[in-house]
């Protein structure tokens, strides 16, 4: 588990360096953005779906349940026996699976790949998806703007600083031509796939350990 965590830390640094090289420093283009790249915003490249108020979707007596993904679960990376539960019959778009990109936009702001198994999406969390663009692209750009979002939330008068949808619209993204998009995707996509696979493996190992340890004692 420790080794996988160290590998993932290294992979995350590599991914950020590649992103910066192409999208911030324009190193492959002698420091100048190519003319055929477009400028857009986060809402142009992805959908940000806010979760449900899950207390309204408790399971009925004879219904199967799902754990609820809240900010606490996102931070710790898994659901546990203290997590709330919801009906498994909620709309499918609110059901989260391994590898989904989740953006906590209220309170503790963070964006991450969820690798803690199937669960229901609570309010104050966005599920980030796109029909047009790949996961590496919308994850990287949301991550890129995260520090700015944290500063905006901090400056709010309320204790629960949060990000409004208009802030997503104000957040600029650069959209490469299809050739460059494929090239960058070939570099970043495998890195993020590996990070997700390592996290899922860590969860499996931890569950195995927790099952076996009591039997060995």
Please tell me what each predicted stretch does.
Residues 1-53, 76, 174, 178-217:
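Non-catalytic DNA-recognition/assembly elements of restriction-modification systems
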Residues 42-45, 138, 168:
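Hydrophobic/aromatic residues in well-formed alpha-helices
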Residues 70, 87-147, 153-158, 164-165:
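A short beta-sheet element
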Residues 40-58, 65-98, 120-121:
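Sequence-specific dsDNA recognition surfaces
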Residues 125-135, 151, 161, 166-196, ...:
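Proline-centric
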Residues 68-70, 102-103, 127, 172, ...:
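Structured core elements
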Residues 80-81, 139, 183:
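Short, charged, solvent-exposed linker or helix-capping segments at domain edges/interfaces
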């Amino acid at each position: 588990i420790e080794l996988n965590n160290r590998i993932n830390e290294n992979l995350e640094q590599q991914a950020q360096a590649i992103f910066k090289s192409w999208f911030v420093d324009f190193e492959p283009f002698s420091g100048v953005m190519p003319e055929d790249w477009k400028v857009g915003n986060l809402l142009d490249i992805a959908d940000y779906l806010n979760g449900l108020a899950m207390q309204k979707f408790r399971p009925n007596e004879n219904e199967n349940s799902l754990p609820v993904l809240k900010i606490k679960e996102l931070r710790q990376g898994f659901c546990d026996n203290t997590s709330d539960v919801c009906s498994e019959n909620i709309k499918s778009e609110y059901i989260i699976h391994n590898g989904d990109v989740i953006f906590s936009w209220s309170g503790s702001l963070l964006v991450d790949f969820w690798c803690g198994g199937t669960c229901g999406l609570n309010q104050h969390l966005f599920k980030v998806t796109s029909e047009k663009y790949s996961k590496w692209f919308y994850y990287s750009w949301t991550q890129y703007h995260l520090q700015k979002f944290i500063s905006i939330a901090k400056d709010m008068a309320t204790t629960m600083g949060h990000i409004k949808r208009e802030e997503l619209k104000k957040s600029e993204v650069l959209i490469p031509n299809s050739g460059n998009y494929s090239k960058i995707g070939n570099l970043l996509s495998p890195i993020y796939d590996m990070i997700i696979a390592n996290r899922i493996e860590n969860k499996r190992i931890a569950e195995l350990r927790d099952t076996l340890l009591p039997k060995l004692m």
